[in-house]
């Protein structure tokens, strides 16, 4: 029997008003969360925010947590969109995050695992091109994080939420 993750599908993602996600599954439709974006975005107020700056905001918010598969999916989407194409298989932030997840799965203690902040710390060296966050970027990153989450949720203050907050700031700086 398949898991709920296998049978659920993301049908609508909107970052225009508030961050909201609609999903349908065999048990019905889930809509949520509809809430204000976290305060990680406060570091980005005052100018157009780029994709890598949104990653840095996530690092400030939840950088202490061990890197997980959901983070890798969201980071890959950000990195691909920032550079405008295929990412390097070995040298990019996605590769570093993937290796960290593989290492973390072998380690039992959370305090010994590689955390999100460690991975994102090298973003300026690893990603040499960048651009302003768009609604399409935010929606794609949210979708990537959701599709790789074992619980079909977004990490509060994580990569997807920080990218959505960056888009909201770019679109309407008075939204926070």
UniProtKB/Swiss-Prot annotation:
Instruction: Supply the InterPro entries for this chain.
Output: LEA_SMP, LEA_SMP_dom
What sequence ranges are listed for the domain SMP? 49-106, 115-171
Going by the UniProt record, its keywords in alphabetical order are: Cytoplasm, Nucleus, Repeat
Where is this chain's protein located in or outside the cell? Cytoplasm; Nucleus
Write down the superkingdom of origin: Eukaryota
Q: Name one GO cellular component term.
A: nucleus
Q: What does this protein do?
A: LEA proteins are late embryonic proteins abundant in higher plant seed embryos. The function of those proteins is not known.
The family classification in the record reads:
Belongs to the LEA type SMP family.
Name the record gives this protein: Late embryogenesis abundant protein 49
């Amino acid at each position: 029997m398949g898991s709920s993750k296998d049978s659920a599908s993301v049908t609508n993602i909107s970052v225009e008003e508030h961050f909201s996600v609609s999903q349908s599954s065999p048990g019905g439709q889930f809509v949520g969360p509809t809430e204000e974006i976290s305060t990680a975005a406060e570091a980005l107020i005052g100018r157009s925010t780029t994709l890598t700056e949104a990653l840095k905001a996530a690092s400030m918010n939840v950088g202490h947590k061990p890197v997980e598969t959901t983070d890798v999916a969201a980071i890959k989407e950000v990195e691909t969109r920032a550079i405008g194409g295929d990412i390097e298989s070995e040298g990019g932030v996605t590769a570093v995050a993937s290796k960290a997840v593989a290492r973390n799965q072998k380690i039992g203690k959370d305090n010994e695992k590689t955390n999100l902040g460690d991975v994102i710390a090298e973003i300026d060296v690893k990603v040499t091109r960048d651009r302003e966050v768009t609604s399409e970027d935010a929606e794609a990153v949210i979708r990537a994080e959701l599709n790789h989450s074992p619980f079909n949720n977004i990490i509060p203050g994580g990569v997807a939420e920080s990218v959505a907050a960056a888009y909201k700031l770019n679109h309407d700086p008075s939204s926070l």
